[in-house]
Amino acid sequence: MSAKLLYNLSDENPNLNKQIGCMNGIFQVFYRQHYPPRRVTGDELKSLPSGKASDNVGDTNISADKKETEKSKKKKTAKEKQRGVSSESSSRLSFSSSPCSSSFSSADISTTASQFEQPGLSNGENPVREPTNGSPRWGGLMMPSDIRELVRSSIHKETRTRDEEALSQQPKSARANVSLLKESSPSRNSNEWSEGRRVVKLKDSPRFSYDERETRKTGAKLKETPRLSLDSRSNSFRSARSSCSPEPQELVTGHRRTTSSVVAKLMGLEVIPDEPVTIQNRENRFCDSPRPTSRVEVDLQRSRGFDSIKKMMPAKFPMKASPWAQVDGAKNQVKIPDATTLTVYGEIQKRLSQLEFKKSEKDLRALKQILEAMEKTQQLISKDDDDNKTLCSSNFMQRNNQPIPSAINTSSMNFKSSSIVVMKAATAPVFKDTGIAGSASFSPRNVALPNVKVGNLRQAQKVIPRKQSAMDVTPRPGYYKGQTESTMKNTSTRPLQSKSDMAKSGKIQKPSVSLRTPPKKLGFEKQSRPTSPKPELNKNQRQQLSRQQTESASPRRKPGIKSRGLQQSEDRLSDESSDLRSLRSDSNVSLASNLDTEVTSRYNYERNSDITEQHTPKQRSPDLGMRSLSKPLKVTVEQPSPVSVLDVAFDEDDSPSPVRKISIVFKEDDNLSSEESHWMNKNNNLCRSIVWPESNTSLKQPDAELTEGFMEDDAEFKNGDHKYISEIMLASGLLRDIDYSMISIQLHQAHLPINPSLFFVLEQNKTSNVSLQDNKHKGRGFGQQQTVNLVERSKRKLIFDTINEILAHRFAAEGCTKQPSITLSISTQRTHEKSSRGEELLQTLCSEIDRLQDNSKCILDEDDEDLIWEDLQSHGMNWKEIEGETPGLVLDIERLIFKDLIGEVVTSEFAAFPRMLSGQPRQLFHC
């Protein structure tokens, strides 16, 4: 009866339940911003907050009253005993689940409860039911459904009365609470009043007790835990919560699904669909699985089967060679797979298979040409070296064993290996089926030549032995032994030989021509036409052929005429080789194909032929090795940029630049061109001193005689360096006879006014004098004296080179190299000013040497700018000299820029396609 009355009273006065909270209610009213209103589900945990000491008394009283109210309510319903146990356990939950429950002891709770419940105890209330604090029986028991509904209804009431709550104040609420308690039940006994008060507090206490604050905070914590980390902390909360109270499975799965979707979006992954997932798929998710590696496999299995994966694996990384390493790299493309893919991985594979290296082919066309030329040249060089070694050895043995016969008609060349012969106007032997007819002494084995076998016998038999024309006097080239048997069998489909090969064969054969064969009918009127038509010969060719004919007919002529004729014939050999090919009936040679054959074979074989020709010194002319032959240059690694700004500068003959001697295509150091070899051979004659004496005897005069003209007048020449300078000037003739016309010629050729060999001539006098003194005083200090002599020699060499450079700068500054009119005017006045100009020049050189020696003794820490400024102030520099060095500098800069551009392009291509091109890019250029 009392319980029903209290329920009705609480419904009529909704503000009554709000004001019972004491200090908790005060905080709820004045500090509402610290208690954000949140809707809390009923299945969440409840725990005590970390309250202050001031809250302990009121809250403990409320919880104690709540226990008695629950017991009285559950007596009037069915199963009174079980409801009492569950009410005690639910009230115990508010104490045991709080993190701050350790601060309360059982003694404090019992004393607080006894203070508020003394009226009930005096009226006969049995306090035996209260001490249930010691043994909490909360294990896996479920919360009663009616208490859960009671908590939910109290929360809904709180939201309706929130505006009224803000206007209430603490003193009024306290007084209203006391008056309302007195007027509510004047006729009720103390037992019913205590039971009703407990029921009211039990009904609305979750809003003001520890449970309210605890549920709000725990709800906030549980909602924010998925955002704090990506590990399985949220799962631990769920497992702890499920162990306390069974929650609906739909809520858990929905919460997991939303959490995984949020995590997937944050990580940039695709969102998992909201379809019901199985246990196997849930294990593969990122939230619940410890390792996320199986996600790719699940996606691949979802789109296609395992068999389709195996089919697509070979096309994932297509093997493709670099476009510059192959001739038609753009044509070799990987076939596009026909199977359509549904995933991103299949699309990536499809695009990788369609990839082409077109951009690099456009940007690196110059690099492609260079690399192809390098590769082709390397193959040709290695092939020619092997062929030339075998050929040189065979030719050398042939010349030593037996001379080569006079003439052999080689109309068709389809042999395993052929001989190198010269055609003469004589009856030539003809090849038969059984052997060789003609000269009885001719035999391939006796001559130590390879066995000759006619490839086309019908054409060979058609060649009738007749008197050849004067064209047949020139050397006829043939195949070398170095060619393989397989290539010789295909002569009908490939060109026979290039111009360079013919030039080599003619060059080698000339020293080995047999001169013991008697000449026969060499006149033009006694010779018939050749077997095949030949082109007309011009006047120069006829004179050349007649000169060669007379030389071969009379071998006792002077060797100078013969060597001159041989040299001229070799110079024209490349021009006449096309005419010689017309004499062959079955040759079918095209000039275009011959020009595309080996480029460097001719030059390499010429070098080897010079070695073999050294064994026949009687027939070799002295000027044979110094001739200039027009031959193609070999392409090497070092090349200028494709488009140079100095292309016109190379064609200028009067350029004073030292780059004038450098050809467009760079060559190796050991392989010099004919122009450079010819220039270097004549260097000894051109690089003379200005007034170089005809004999060295005039230089071996005493030192006193050389310096007598200057030692008497000037005492400064007593210095050793000045004395040596005067010796250099007198020995070179600059002080005696200054001829500026010769200076202009000399500086233009050698860039130095004094021949460097003059130093060694002067040192002969020094060493002769020193050797006489060493012989007299040879003994204990002989080794030390040699060391001193070496030091002095090095010092004199340094002075000599310095004087030479100073003179070169001085003469170039006066304009003697570019203004011949000035040189002539100076040369006409040299008789009047010879002595004065000589003394002035000598004094200038001595002062310059002294200044340089003083600068060498300066402090090393001195600023470089001060030294340069001092040099500029002391003597004016000829800035026009730098113009001669400009082409070389520009070429070097162009080459460096070209290398850097190629390196950057290749590196960027490797970075753009790391999977297409495996391995590290090798360094292309070594600076």
UniProtKB/Swiss-Prot annotation:
Residues 86-114, 232-245 have a biased composition (Low complexity). Disruption phenotype: No visible phenotype under normal growth conditions, but the lng1 and lng2 double mutant shows reduced length of cotyledons, rosette leaves, siliques and flowers. Expressed in roots, petioles, leaf blades and floral organs. Residues 115-125, 182-193, 483-500, 538-553 have a biased composition (Polar residues). It is found in: Nucleus. Coiled coil: none annotated. Keywords: Nucleus. It comes from the Eukaryota. Transmembrane segments: none annotated. PANTHER family: LONGIFOLIA PROTEIN, PROTEIN LONGIFOLIA 1. The gain-of-function mutant lng1-1D (T-DNA tagging) shows increased elongation of aerial lateral organs, partly due to elongated cells in leaves, petals and siliques. This is Protein LONGIFOLIA 1. It comes from Arabidopsis thaliana. The lineage of its organism: Eukaryota, Viridiplantae, Streptophyta, Embryophyta, Tracheophyta.
